[in-house]
Swiss-Prot record:
Keyword Chaperone: yes
Organism: Natronomonas pharaonis (strain ATCC 35678 / DSM 2160 / CIP 103997 / JCM 8858 / NBRC 14720 / NCIMB 2260 / Gabara)
Biased composition (Basic and acidic residues): 492-513
Role, per record: Acts as a chaperone.
NCBIfam families: PRK00290.1 (NF001413), prok_dnaK (TIGR02350)
SUPFAM superfamilies in alphabetical order: Actin-like ATPase domain (SSF53067), Heat shock protein 70kD (HSP70), C-terminal subdomain (SSF100934), Heat shock protein 70kD (HSP70), peptide-binding domain (SSF100920)
Superkingdom of this protein's organism: Archaea
CDD domains, A to Z: ASKHA_NBD_HSP70_DnaK-like (cd10234)
Name used for this protein in its record: Chaperone protein DnaK
Keywords of this entry: ATP-binding, Chaperone, Nucleotide-binding
Database matches in Pfam families: HSP70
Length: 656
């Protein structure tokens, strides 16, 4: 019989925990080995047996080649596989093996089948990593009801005072990832205000520091690099992890690994003492790497450390005294320690499961997307549709247009990140919209819609509003951000902000110049008899000047803008002449379409093709006369999307 309970799972890098609501409270489930946490380790033995959890970890020294650990660090990587004999496994498949054990152990504990689960992920996981986690759950046989950010789940587990409003900082340092989140709490509402992190920082890195210290010392003394022997390296791993744990409660630890290597003269032993002070000096750079994300999260939330009411530590790595001291230094207060940091996330996941099943009815969780989402537009710019730290679920739409005449298809490229240039962010996916009726550049209206669900998973749709054709894409598991890319994304965005902005301004100026040239050609062709010879000569001279600047690859923003404005001023005279003609004829609509949608233009004025505001209405509302005026027709609506994607200025809609 299937239980209606929803299992809460903390799928960790080094250890996992799982819990369920019992009698109104979350309860950690003891696994089949009688323990409250399960090592996230999978092994394959010579006789084909598959081991998961503690049995896999216990035999790692004897079987290092076929023992897989810390697979979470590779979730969402398209090309990453684990080779075991003649077989290959993806990170999702290995994670599913861990989840299958969790499912079996939970069912044995509860005496019922468990079909549904809430699984947690680091707050800074990108879309591909979230999708990969969801896939792993489904491979394991779960209906994944929700993907929840780990710091948010932890905040729910701490049982903070529901009656008073408070701001909480969650510092989550696990085995392989680091997250920090700022939440506003009150009345049972858990609202994430900002989040940041480093997906390539965790307790494993502290272990590696000890391993390198021991291996370097041994190599210096004996001339043998233990890291080249898989079995010796696995013994070093286990010794380093044990030393790290001991140094959280002791000032010194001894490491003794007999027969770790051998020479012609006989076996060699490794004996070393490490003090806490030495350990902290070896790893000081690691704890410092948590400072930047913490300060950035506070800045994004608009808070100072004095605004924080409570600080919560999550993850086994926060037991290290050096970490606790750093957190207190960053926040100015002592963190709460009333919940086991290894269990907090799993307990919180169970609470969220209780919310979804109806067992808990006084909690509302409002999470956020950690990175901005958008598409590539003309000139290679990144056009954001959803900003980072936006509460999810959410949906956002923008209308774009084509940049070439008679374009019948467009390529929509979806990116995630904080850089102004699309290629410098992470490409999540791409798809084509075809069947667009041939039309002048700037005429088609293509609406692009981004939707992020409660799990943080992205769906993008593009629809040609003229033909009704539409295509969409759900970003599936695949090659996601590398650990290093995610770690550096915010830092790079800040470092290159000024450079990116200058590039954006220059690209926009060039786009505006090209659009104004296109508009000028259209106006002259469509109004050949209405433009006198002197004005035509002036406009053509300005067009020649602007073409020369556009063709100059070294032309800067000011040169492009100056030449564009000169042509725009000349184009204004067409509008004046036509207005005078219309006034004289008593027919105000005679040439409005050609003049650029003057006074009553459709959305976007003349559908200006310049990014950052299609419509390009010139001074006085003369649609189409100013820089950015585009090729759309008066009253036909906004201008829309293409492989070059040009943005629409919705403000012009108000002119109708």
């Amino acid at each position: 019989m299937a239980s209606n309970k929803i299992l809460g799972i903390d799928l960790g890098t080094t250890n996992s925990a799982f819990a369920v609501m019992e009698g109104g409270d979350p309860e950690i489930i003891v696994n089949s080995e009688g323990e409250r946490t399960t090592p996230s380790v999978v092994a394959f033995t010579d006789d084909g047996e598959r081991l998961v959890g503690k049995p896999a970890k216990n035999q790692a020294v004897q079987n290092p080649e076929d023992t897989i650990q810390s697979i979470k660090r590779h979730m969402g990587e398209d090309d990453y596989t684990v080779e075991v004999g003649d077989d290959e496994y993806t990170p999702e498949q290995i994670s599913a093996m861990i989840l299958q054990k969790i499912k079996r152990d939970a069912e044995e504990y509860l005496g019922d089948d468990i079909e549904k689960a809430v699984i947690t992920v680091p707050a800074y996981f990108n879309d591909r990593q979230r999708q990969a986690t969801k896939d792993a759950g489904e491979i394991a046989g779960f209906e994944v009801e929700r993907i929840v950010n780990e710091p948010t789940a932890a905040a729910m587990a701490y049982g903070l005072d529901d009656e008073s409003d408070q701001t909480v900082l969650v510092y989550d340092l696990g085995g392989g990832t680091f997250d920090v989140s700022i939440l506003d709490l009150g009345g049972g509402v858990y609202e994430v205000v900002a989040t940041n992190g480093d997906n390539d920082l965790g307790g494993d890195d502290w272990d590696e520091a000890i391993i390198d210290y021991l291996a370097d010392s041994f190599e210096e003394e004996h001339g043998i690099d233990l890291r080249e022997d898989r079995q010796a390296l696995q013994r070093l791993h286990e010794a380093a992890e044990e030393a790290k744990i001991e140094l959280s409660s002791r000032k010194e630890t001894n490491i003794n690994l007999p027969f770790i290597a051998a020479t012609d003269e006989g076996p060699l032993n490794l004996e070393e003492s490490i003090s806490r002070a030495k350990f902290e000096s070896l790893t000081s750079d690691l704890v410092e790497r948590t400072v930047g994300p913490t300060e950035q999260a506070l800045d994004d939330a608009g808070y100072s450390k004095g605004d924080i009411d409570e600080v919560i530590l999550v993850g086994g790595s926060t037991r290290m005294p050096m970490v606790q001291e750093k957190v207190e230094e960053l926040t100015g207060q002592e963190p709460k320690k009333n919940v086991n940091p290894d269990e907090a996330v799993g307990l919180g996941a169970a609470i969220q499961g209780g919310v979804l099943s109806g067992d808990v009815d006084d909690i509302v969780l409002l999470d956020v997307t950690p990175l901005s989402l958008g598409i590539e537009v003309k000139g290679g710019l990144f056009e954001r549709l959803i900003d980072k730290n936006t509460t999810i679920p959410t949906e956002a739409s923008k209308v774009f247009t084509t940049a070439a005449d008679n374009q019948t298809s467009v390529n929509i490229r979806v990116f995630q990140g904080e850089r102004e240039i699309a290629e410098e962010n992470e490409l999540l996916g791409a798809f084509q919209l075809t069947g667009i009726p041939p039309a002048p550049a700037g005429t088609p209206q293509i609406e692009v819609t981004f939707n992020i669900d409660e799990n943080g998973i992205v769906n993008v749709e593009a629809e040609d509003q003229g033909s009704g054709n539409k295509e969409d894409i759900t970003i599936e598991g695949g090659v996601g951000l590398s650990d290093e890319e995610i770690e550096e994304m915010q830092e790079e965005a800040e470092k290159h902000a000024e450079e990116d902005e200058k590039r954006r301004e220059r690209i926009e100026a060039r786009n505006e110049a090209e659009s104004t040239l296109q508009r000028a050609e259209t106006l002259l062709d469509e109004n050949e008899d209405a433009v006198d010879d002197d004005l035509r000569a002036d406009i053509e001279a300005s067009m020649d000047d602007l073409r020369e600047v556009v063709e100059d690859e070294d032309a800067d923003t000011d040169e492009l803008t100056e030449a564009t404005e000169a042509l725009a001023e000349a184009l204004q005279e067409i509008g004046k002449q036509m207005y005078q003609q219309q006034a004289g004829e008593g027919g105000a609509g005679a040439g409005a379409g050609a003049a650029g949608g003057m006074g009553g233009a459709g959305p976007g004025g003349m559908g200006g093709a310049g990014p950052g505001g299609m419509g390009g209405a010139g001074p006085g509302g003369m649609g189409g006369a100013g820089p950015g005026a585009g090729a759309g027709q008066q009253g036909d609506g906004e201008e829309f999307v293409d492989a070059d994607f040009e943005d629409v200025d919705d403000e012009d809609d108000e002119d109708e």
